Every structure is written in structure tokens, then in C-alpha cells.
């Protein structure tokens, strides 16, 4: 039986690698240059919660403590990493044993579910249309979907490998 510690370690390692590649793919789009959908979840959360957080003084306290400005690149990058790792944890704890098939298929299913939520809920709520079609061309939508899918498939495949290795005692990565 796998321990929660090995599950978390495998998820964080797989998630770190997958979010690193995803981030590199999205950065490469900037070099092309190609506009892709990104930051939708952060924009939506900002739209929904910013007024309440401002009234509660969270923004002022945040700045006084010297944390990165939420609209800035550093905060956005950190948010992207944290969400990627949270998605890795969600996969390892709740989805991995429930989704059918091999790891790559589980990753595709996870990618499809999250992409559908982003395309049909998050981006339309932001006024960007289905899959961001109001501001993105077909190539931008496709590139974003591909970078997104790479994250989830790589996450699932690496998680299976690292979790299996840790169970067999073959993985020498320590999270102590």
C-alpha cells in the first residue's frame, strides 16, 4: 500500500517537471510571437474576489509585507506554478485511482476535463468567448490546448513512474 508521503512526493516531483515544461512551451509562444490563452483562472479569481479582499485590507497588507504585486509577472508566474502543483496533488489524491486506463490516457482525460472547464466556463465568464475565441486565432487556441495537454499527460505518466519507483524502492529522491 502506498503511503501518503510517497504519493505526495511523486505528485510534487511529476508536477514540477510537467509545469516546468508547460511554462517553457507557453514562453516559447511569446518568442514566435503567438498569443495564447493564459492567466484565465487568475483573472477570474481577481474579478470575483478582488473587491472583497480590498475591503478587508488584504491588498495593503500584501504590499506592506513586500509580496509581489498580483498584476505583476512574478506573482503570475508563482500562481501558475502553485496551480500546476495543486493540479498534480488533485490528480494523485483524487483522480489517479478513479480514472480508467493507462497513465497517458488518464492524463488525456484530465486534460480534456480541465480544458473544457476553461474553454466553456472560465474564458466565457471573462468575456473572452468559448476557448478565448474572441481574442485568439485558431493557432493560438490550438497551441494553448497542446501545451495544456502536454502538462496533464506528462504529469500522469511521470506520476505513475515515480510512484511505482518509490513503491519498489528504486527512486532515490527524498522529500524529508
Each predicted region: which residue ranges?
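Short, charged juxtamembrane terminal tails flanking transmembrane helices
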Residues: 1-5, 163-176
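N-terminal signal-anchor transmembrane alpha helix
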Residues: 2-38
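Extracytosolic (periplasmic/ER-lumenal) interhelical loops and adjacent juxtamembrane/interface segments
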Residues: 31, 35-70
Amino acid at each position: 500500500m502506498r503511503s501518503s508521503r510517497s504519493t505526495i512526493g511523486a505528485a510534487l516531483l511529476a508536477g514540477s517537471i510537467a509545469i516546468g515544461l508547460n511554462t517553457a512551451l507557453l514562453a516559447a509562444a511569446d518568442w514566435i510571437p503567438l498569443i495564447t490563452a493564459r492567466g484565465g483562472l487568475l483573472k477570474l479569481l481577481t474579478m470575483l474576489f478582488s473587491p472583497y479582499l480590498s475591503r478587508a485590507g488584504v491588498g495593503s497588507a500584501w504590499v506592506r509585507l513586500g509580496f509581489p504585486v498580483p498584476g505583476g509577472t512574478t506573482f503570475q508566474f508563482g500562481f501558475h506554478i502553485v496551480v500546476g502543483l495543486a493540479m498534480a496533488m488533485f490528480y494523485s489524491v483524487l483522480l489517479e485511482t478513479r480514472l480508467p486506463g493507462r497513465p497517458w490516457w488518464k492524463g488525456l482525460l484530465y486534460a480534456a476535463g480541465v480544458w473544457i472547464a476553461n474553454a466553456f466556463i472560465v474564458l466565457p465568464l471573462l468575456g473572452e468567448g468559448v476557448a478565448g475565441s474572441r481574442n485568439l486565432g485558431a493557432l493560438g487556441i490550438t497551441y494553448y490546448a497542446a501545451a495544456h495537454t502536454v502538462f496533464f499527460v506528462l504529469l500522469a505518466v511521470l506520476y505513475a513512474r515515480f510512484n511505482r519507483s518509490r513503491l519498489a524502492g528504486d527512486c532515490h529522491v527524498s522529500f524529508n
